[in-house]
Structure formats: C-alpha cells, structure tokens
C-alpha cells in the first residue's frame, strides 16, 4: 500500500471521502487542491498539515494564503498549481478527484513522475485515454481506478490477463429509472441531484440521472482494460450491490459485491495489492429478500447513454467534444438556465456539428474541448 498521497479535489464529494480514508489508514497527505471552497480547504489543511494547497480560483487562493499565514503551508493559485500539487515530492500516489477535463494536465504530470494514480476523474480517460494509458506504460505509473464499477472490474480481473471475454458494466439507473423520456421533461436540478443509492456531487449526480455518467464509464472502461465497445455490456442494476462483473473466456462470470460506499474503492486504490479493514458497513445479502435485479437499459429513454456509446465507437475527438459539451450543459442546468432535456439536445448538437479528428494529440484535444464549450454557450446564447 501507499503511505503518502496528494488529493486533487479534496473539497469535493470523492475528495472528502478520500480525506476520511486517509485518516483511517494513517496516510501522510502531502498536498490538497480545491477550486474555491477555501473554508473547507483551510479546515482540511489545519487538520492534515500538507506541505502545499492549490486553489484554482486565483482570488480564492489569495484569501486562503492570508488565512494560513500563521502556518508553514504553501498556497498556490491557478491551474498550474494543480500540477504542482500532483508532482510534489515524497508522494506515493495522487488521487485525482477533481471534476471535469481540468484533471488531464495534473494526471499526466503525476504519471510522468511515475506516481500511482488513484483515478476518480473519468474525464481524463474520456478525453485522452490513448495518450494517458500510453504515458502510464512509458513511465511505469500504475493507474488504479476509484470509480466503483472500474474498481470492481479491476478486482475481478486481477491475475486474469488475457482471459477476459466481456465486461458487464452495472448502473443503478439513477433517480428516474423506469421513467419514459417524456416523463423527464420537467425534471428540476433538485430532482436530478437526489440519487437513490449513492452520495455524490451535483455534477455527477446529474450525469447519473441522464446516464451520461454510465456512458463516460463505458469509454473509461475501454481505455483502462484495453477493450472495444463490443466487449462491454451495460446492465441496469437498481440495488447497486453488484458493482460490475466480468465474463471470462470459458463462460465463468465473476462479480464484485459490496455496499454502495465510495470509501471502499477509494481505500482499495490506496492499499492495493493489500487489503485493510475499512470503516464501511458490511454487505448483508439477506437484506434483499426480493433478490438482485439486472436488465438492459432503454436507450430511447436514455439518449445520453446512447450518444456516449456512439461516440465511443467513433473515437478520436468525439468523446472529448461530448464530454466538454456536457460539462457546460450540466452547469447551465444546475444554474436553472436550461431545461433537463436541453442537456442531451445541446450535447448531441455539438457532437453533430464538430467533426471528429482521429488520433489527436493533446493540442488537438484541447482545441476540440474549447470548441465544444463555446458551441454550447452559443447554442443557448450565453
């Protein structure tokens, strides 16, 4: 297991849970980062005593620097400070818990230092999976997934390289499972962020409601495990007990089960290949007397999932465009500026309008990302 970590996005949902896991395991936290939640960042810094705190919002960084003036903790501002946090010395692993494509640069920076990446930022692989995985091989950096589904697949495949036939990627179906497309027209942000099983941040909660999150995970799985879209089957699993499964060449299916608690995959990413006692509840299968259920997703009712699967097949910059457009659209929805159905409509329009580029380098990926963001803002005249 690792002994010292940096937490990128420590004030978000996954970041806060990572702090709790680090406390439980007795890990040394070398760096923290936040966007602008400096009140929580200050509390974390005073408790964990990191060497460095990065704040991407420059004005907030100045305020935190003043607040921590009585300590020896350095405070950096701007996106470059994220990379500083990712490469700070004496760090065994970097937990990438920031939300969105902003996680790409610091992840690559940490990879180039040979650090273990506890990957909770799926957008990094969605946007630049080929590049990230190639760099990880080049620099000998381990990538251990934190997403519960990918952690499950990772655990099921340990020691079984070359034996995989199919990945069975599960998802709860979100708060609107079973609803028709028309029935979701008047969904509000407050409704969308209320997930039945998981405690998550606002953006990923909306993505879970639209099932875009499962689409992003579909693409992430392709890169993490070196498979094609035909090798992945999405299953709706309302109970969120089976976190994913793998079917092996001989027809055997291996599943990873557990309570829906992100503390478990976070801890495993930091203790791998060891296992340590956790603070999570134990799974009691007798609590499910009606059984565990699995069924195919209704892609007509879940167009974001269908769109993501199409972009996965297209490849190139198509997933980058989709992801960037979705980030802007979800932000507008959470701000009560657009309707729920407008998320899909604007993202699909961006994917249709912006031609994909095959085998892009990082400059092309960044350009596609920016073009997609500008497209959605223009689409809604913002």
Predicted regions span which residues?
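Catalytic, metal-anchored helix/loop core of enzyme active sites in primary metabolism
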Residues: 1-382
């Amino acid at each position: 297991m690792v002994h010292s970590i940096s937490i990128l996005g420590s004030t978000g949902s996954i970041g806060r849970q990572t702090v709790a896991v680090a406390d439980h395991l007795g890990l040394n936290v070398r760096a923290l980062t936040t966007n602008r939640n400096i009140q929580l960042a200050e509390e974390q810094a005073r408790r964990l005593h990191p060497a460095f705190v990065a704040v991407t919002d420059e004005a907030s960084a100045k305020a935190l620097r003043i607040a921590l003036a009585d300590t020896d903790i350095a405070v950096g501002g701007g996106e470059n400070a994220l990379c500083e946090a990712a490469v700070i010395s004496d760090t065994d692993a970097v937990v990438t818990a920031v939300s969105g494509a902003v996680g790409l640069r610091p992840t690559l920076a940490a990879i180039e230092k040979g650090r273990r990446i506890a990957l909770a930022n799926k957008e990094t692989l969605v946007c630049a999976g080929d590049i990230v995985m190639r760099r990880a091989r080049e620099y000998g950096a381990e990538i251990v997934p934190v997403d519960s589904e990918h952690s499950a697949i990772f655990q099921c495949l340990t020691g079984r390289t070359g034996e995989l036939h199919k990945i069975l990627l599960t998802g709860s179906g979100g708060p609107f499972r079973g609803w028709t497309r028309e029935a979701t027209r008047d969904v509000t942000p407050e409704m969308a962020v209320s997930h039945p099983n998981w405690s998550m941040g606002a953006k990923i909660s909306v993505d879970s409601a639209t099932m875009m999150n499962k689409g992003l995970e579909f693409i992430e799985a392709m890169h993490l495990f070196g498979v094609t879209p035909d090798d992945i089957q999405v299953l709706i699993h309302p109970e969120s007990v089976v976190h994913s499964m793998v079917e092996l060449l001989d027809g055997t299916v291996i599943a990873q089960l557990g309570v829906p608690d992100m503390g478990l995959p976070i801890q495993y990413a930091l203790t791998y290949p060891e296992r340590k006692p956790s603070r999570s509840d134990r799974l009691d299968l007798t609590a499910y007397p009606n059984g565990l259920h699995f069924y195919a997703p209704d892609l007509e009712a879940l167009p974001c999932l269908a769109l993501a699967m199409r972009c996965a097949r297209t490849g190139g910059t198509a997933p980058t465009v989709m992801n960037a457009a979705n980030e802007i659209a979800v932000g507008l929805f959470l701000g009560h500026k657009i309707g729920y159905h407008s998320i899909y409509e604007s993202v699909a329009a961006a994917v249709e309008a912006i031609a994909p580029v095959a085998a892009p380098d990082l400059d092309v990926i960044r350009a596609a990302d920016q073009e997609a963001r500008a497209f959605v803002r223009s689409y809604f005249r913002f």
